């Protein structure tokens, strides 16, 4: 007889239980992130540690976002406790989860907490678990005077003098009200309610009932709620990404749709009986010195290098903190004013933004534009999907156009947040940038006469600086501000001379100007321009505005004349605060200075102000005539008269003036906190609405010519092969041997040999006969949702992402792929795709009995990591390697694979930290590319064949006829050394490699301060040592 089932909780059906579990699951993720913050940013004692079994260090963005959330809630409680009152005080945390805020405050501010009782309230199930954890933790129980742990079926789970824990569903307000009035609250008391991202998971009616009930619990009540909102509607890229995330978790946000704005949230509380309510975004609070003082903001950078400012601002702009009170209204809070547009400042009707957005095209952020011609530009370096890139993407205006000037060579280290400034004759200067925020670059590279070479380095590494061309006796590149590797915000001006090929310091007049990075620097003419925006040393966007003029003395030294026009522009322009920007791009056009994207202080850039125009002609007139008020200097272009594509996220982008009346925008996007990444894909062309030209700018598929280093170019003869021409066809391709494996010992010998073989004659089950299109559709289910790759060409590239991920039904996919569509399915976990590897038996149970590995491959079965199902149409998979060994079992159709031994990786254009090559091995004419110094091997798999692929063998695959169906089984062949943590796809590099890459960064950094040629000399010697060790 089996064990008796526990009775279900009274009044709670299984659906409600499941919903509650999903909501409680969001708390698990939240406290792991808060634990990460605690470990780094909080002094001991630590309290999250008792509720988080496996701590994880989150990214700097997640850490700072949760630091701000934690600070907001804690400061609100401290403010409440500091208020003078003759009543006992109670802090009621509604939906507290495992948050240990009471214990943290009792430990750090015991005197301040003397007259306050903390009451945690959440689901019964959660509070029982919390009680169990607290009971076992002396460090917490010692803080709780006269603590008593009550039975699980009691409403009050924990009772002590300073702290109580209550188990109650917030939808059961009758029970909660009874418990609080009978067992917790005296008749006269001051109450502060807390609700940190908890009520929004309730249906709106239930959440509003809590808000109304709370206003009547005490005549001296306050409410602090922290939740998400839509500062610019649900279609904003961050907002839409956030909403998809919570929906995918099964815990959608409800209140945000009913009360999307701050004004509506305030009115919600007033309608519920609260005398006054005031809401502010977290980004607004971050910028408030009274809430987070400047020294505290600056101190955070010393704990953890940070440069995710755009993403931090987007997060903070979508979360609000609202404070409401039932106390008599003393003075009405100032109403929120929005910067409106009038016919004089709204110029959106005069412009249009044309989008050309093929999915997966141009996914790159924080790069730089490489000038080429009026029909071609490059997008250099920056951050790709996986890592920083050293490559340059080519964009052209018409099909068949090729670049006319050289792009930066591949041996310039990958970087982001650098500048490239265009000079005459299509010369240009590349300056600085960074790897990590603690590892800036000071090297500089110049293209002159269509050749790239290094030039004098900066005095110190510099990134997030601003640069512009000026012309005096010759051309100069003027550089201002930025940050350096130790986190210092710079306030110096430098000028690089195209004649002398060196840097010189630029003196300035005595006017006070704050150091900054990410500022807007623009030209008005050859020697003068404007400076505004940027983030200062204390972590807020600056709101000043300067004009500058560069002078040259007779001795050749340079002098900068700065004039502060902040007050003048604030007085005469209603949109002045909309150009206080960080990370925007500025281009000189016939219309004036066009300011694109970035972030602004305290709020978000709304769609109607994404692109701004500063009329430099009007500005010059105003300066000359004493700033009359009838001039329109700043106007808004927004996103133009009509937007014919998805809304772009204009951060991390680049832009350039193609001609005096067209601006081309490329790249950009952001990591939307923990919700996912949004990419601004394709090309965007801003032009006058009267223009008749269309946006024909497009990304040319990746180059097939290997990047030659500068030294190779200097020593080799010019090649007749252009970058857009194919390789020669490989003449010698070794066939992979075919073998029969009859027992595990034979396969063990193959493993020890470490070379690929095709195993034939094995029994993999009835799948080879059964798995037709009709059978698979019926067995899997035609309505089942899957995610597939949809390719734009016959060759998929992981580097350029010339494909998109599409969610569709399995039946639709099978119809389309069998009709010849370029689609590819690599199955992922059906239950937890971001946490668990694919498992054919679990993900497709109806297929599990059809497929089996032969007994001779028992070592594979015993050490299996994952077993994805692969179904491919006429599309080629990119060249890549897997860290784990695997066997590829061909079930239906045929497939051709080309493999390269691990020693060939140095010739196959695999960027550092990546596992995929940039080369198309299968060329458009069907031949295999001949890559010098490599030894390609070929496998043609027929039905029932099993290809053993050893670890690190690079391989690419292409169907040779109809649809290919295969099962891929990855297995662990090492006892240790794999990457720590989660590895869903089995392709994370070994721990030793990742550690060594960090060591390389440290080695390179140790040469900071040396002349660049000396540093290069020694780094090349070290590289030779590494190569010698690798070849022993």
Curated annotation (Swiss-Prot):
Question: Pfam family of this protein, just one?
Answer: Cupin_8
Task: Spell out the Polar residues composition-biased ranges.
Answer: 716-725
Q: Where is the JmjC domain?
A: 833-988
Q: Name one GO molecular function term.
A: tRNA methyltransferase activity
Which EC number(s) does the record attach to this protein? 2.1.1.290, 2.3.1.231
Which reaction is the catalytic activity of this chain? 7-[(3S)-3-amino-3-carboxypropyl]wyosine(37) in tRNA(Phe) + S-adenosyl-L-methionine = 7-[(3S)-(3-amino-3-methoxycarbonyl)propyl]wyosine(37) in tRNA(Phe) + S-adenosyl-L-homocysteine; 7-[(3S)-(3-amino-3-methoxycarbonyl)propyl]wyosine(37) in tRNA(Phe) + S-adenosyl-L-methionine + CO2 = wybutosine(37) in tRNA(Phe) + S-adenosyl-L-homocysteine + 2 H(+)
Q: What residue spans carry the region label Disordered?
A: 702-726
Which EC class is the enzyme in? transferase
Q: List the PROSITE patterns.
A: JMJC (PS51184)
What is this protein's function?
Answer: Probable S-adenosyl-L-methionine-dependent methyltransferase that acts as a component of the wybutosine biosynthesis pathway. Wybutosine is a hyper modified guanosine with a tricyclic base found at the 3'-position adjacent to the anticodon of eukaryotic phenylalanine tRNA. May methylate the carboxyl group of leucine residues to form alpha-leucine ester residues.
Q: What is this protein called?
A: tRNA wybutosine-synthesizing protein 4
Give the source species.
Aspergillus oryzae (strain ATCC 42149 / RIB 40) (Yellow koji mold)
Give the classification, highest ranks.
Eukaryota, Fungi, Dikarya, Ascomycota, Pezizomycotina
């Amino acid at each position: 007889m089996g064990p008796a089932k526990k009775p279900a909780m009274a009044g709670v059906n299984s659906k409600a239980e499941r919903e509650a579990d999903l909501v409680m699951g969001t708390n698990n993720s939240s406290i792991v992130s808060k634990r990460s913050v605690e470990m780094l940013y909080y002094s001991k004692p630590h309290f999250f540690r008792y509720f988080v079994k496996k701590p994880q260090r989150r990214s700097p963005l997640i850490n700072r976002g949760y630091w701000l959330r934690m600070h907001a809630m804690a400061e609100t409680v401290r403010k409440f406790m500091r208020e003078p009152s003759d009543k006992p005080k109670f802090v009621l945390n509604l939906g507290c989860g495992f948050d240990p805020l009471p214990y943290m405050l009792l430990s750090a501010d015991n005197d301040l907490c003397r007259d306050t009782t903390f009451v945690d309230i959440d689901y019964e199930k959660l509070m029982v678990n919390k009680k169990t954890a607290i009971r076992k933790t002396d460090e917490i129980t010692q803080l709780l005077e006269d603590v008593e742990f009550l039975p699980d079926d009691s409403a009050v789970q924990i009772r002590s003098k300073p702290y109580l824990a209550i188990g109650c569903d917030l939808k059961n307000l009758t029970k909660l009200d009874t418990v609080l009035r009978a067992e917790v609250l005296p008749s006269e008391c001051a109450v502060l309610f807390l609700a940190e991202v908890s009520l929004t998971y309730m249906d709106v009616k239930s959440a509003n009932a809590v808000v109304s009930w709370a206003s009547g619990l005490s005549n001296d009540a306050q409410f602090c709620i922290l939740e998400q909102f839509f500062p610019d509607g649900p279609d904003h890229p961050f907002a839409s990404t956030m909403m998809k995330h919570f929906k995918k978790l099964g815990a959608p946000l409800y209140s945000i749709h009913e009360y999307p704005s701050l004004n509506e949230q305030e009115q919600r509380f007033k309608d519920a009986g609260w005398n006054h309510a005031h809401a502010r975004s977290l980004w607004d609070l971050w910028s408030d010195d009274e809430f987070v003082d400047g020294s505290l903001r600056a101190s955070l950078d010393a704990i953890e290098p940070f440069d995710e400012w755009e993403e931090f601002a987007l997060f903070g702009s979508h979360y609000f903190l609202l404070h409401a009170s039932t106390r008599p209204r003393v003075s009405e809070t100032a109403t929120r004013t929005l910067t409106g547009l009038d016919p004089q400042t709204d110029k959106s009707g005069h412009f249009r933004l044309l989008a050309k957005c093929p999915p997966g095209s141009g996914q790159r952020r924080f790069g730089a534009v490489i000038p080429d011609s009026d029909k071609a530009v490059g997008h250099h370096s920056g951050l790709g999907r996986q890592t920083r890139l050293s490559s340059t993407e080519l964009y052209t205006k018409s099909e068949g156009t090729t670049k006319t000037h050289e792009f930066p060579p591949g041996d310039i280290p990958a970087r982001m947040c650098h500048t490239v400034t265009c000079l005459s004759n299509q010369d240009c200067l590349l300056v600085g940038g960074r790897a990590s925020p603690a590892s800036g670059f000071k090297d500089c590279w110049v293209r002159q006469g269509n050749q790239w070479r290094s030039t004098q380095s900066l005095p110190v590494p510099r990134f997030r600086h601003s640069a512009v061309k000026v012309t005096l006796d010759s051309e100069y590149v003027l550089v201002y501000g930025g940050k350096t590797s130790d986190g210092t915000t710079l306030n110096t001006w430098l000028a690089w001379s195209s004649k002398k090929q060196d840097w010189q310091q630029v003196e300035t007049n005595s006017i006070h100007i704050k150091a900054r990075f990410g500022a807007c620097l623009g030209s008005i003419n050859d020697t003068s321009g404007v400076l505004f925006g940027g983030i200062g040393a204390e972590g807020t966007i600056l709101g000043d505005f300067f004009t500058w003029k560069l002078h040259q003395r007779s001795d050749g030294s340079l002098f900068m004349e700065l004039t502060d026009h902040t007050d003048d522009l604030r007085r005469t322009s209603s949109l002045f605060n909309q150009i206080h920007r960080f990370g925007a791009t500025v281009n000189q056009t016939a219309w004036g200075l066009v300011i694109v994207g970035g972030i602004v202080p305290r709020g978000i850039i709304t769609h109607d102000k994404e692109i701004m125009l500063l009329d430099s002609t009007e500005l010059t007139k105003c300066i000359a005539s004493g700033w009359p008020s009838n001039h329109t200097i700043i106007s808004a272009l927004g996103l133009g008269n009509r937007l014919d594509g998805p809304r772009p996220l204009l951060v991390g982008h680049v832009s350039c003036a193609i001609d005096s009346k067209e601006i081309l925008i490329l790249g950009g996007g952001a990591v939307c906190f923990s919700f996912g990444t949004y990419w601004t894909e394709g090309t965007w062309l801003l032009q006058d609405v009267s223009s008749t030209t269309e946006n024909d700018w497009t990304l040319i598929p990746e180059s097939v010519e290997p990047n030659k280093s500068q030294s190779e170019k200097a020593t080799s003869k010019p090649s007749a092969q252009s970058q857009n021409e194919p390789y020669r066809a490989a003449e010698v391709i070794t066939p992979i041997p075919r073998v029969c494996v009859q027992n595990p010992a034979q396969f063990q010998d193959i493993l020890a040999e470490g070379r690929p073989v095709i195993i034939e004659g094995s029994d993999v089950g009835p799948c080879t006969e059964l798995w037709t299109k009709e059978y698979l559709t019926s067995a899997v289910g035609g309505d089942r949702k899957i995610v597939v790759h949809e390719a734009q060409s016959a060759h998929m590239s992981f580097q350029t992402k010339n494909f998109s991920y599409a969610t569709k039904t399995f039946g639709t996919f099978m119809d389309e792929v069998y009709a010849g569509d370029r689609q590819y399915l690599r199955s992922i976990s059906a239950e937890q795709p971001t946490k668990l590897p694919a498992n054919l038996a679990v993900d497709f149970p109806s297929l599990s009995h059809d497929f089996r590995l032969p007994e001779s491959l028992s070592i594979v079965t015993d050490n299996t990591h994952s077993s994805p199902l692969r179904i491919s149409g006429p599309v080629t998979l990119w060249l890549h390697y897997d860290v784990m060994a695997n066997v590829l079992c061909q079930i239906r159709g045929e497939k051709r694979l080309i493999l390269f031994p691990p020693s060939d990786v140095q010739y196959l254009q695999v960027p550092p930290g990546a596992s995929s090559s940039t080369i198309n091995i299968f060329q458009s004419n069907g031949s295999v590319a001949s890559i010098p110094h490599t030894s390609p091997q070929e496998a043609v798999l027929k039905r029932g064949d099993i290809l053993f692929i050893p670890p690190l063998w690079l391989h690419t695959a292409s169907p040779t006829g109809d649809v290919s169906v295969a099962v891929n089984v990855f297995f662990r062949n090492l006892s240790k050394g794999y990457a720590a943590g989660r590895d869903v796809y089995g392709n994370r590099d070994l721990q030793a490699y990742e550690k060594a890459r960090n060591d390389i960064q440290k080695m390179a950094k140790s040469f900071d301060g040396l002349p660049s040629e000396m540093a290069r000399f020694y780094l090349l010697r070290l590289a030779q040592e590494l190569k010698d060790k690798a070849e022993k």
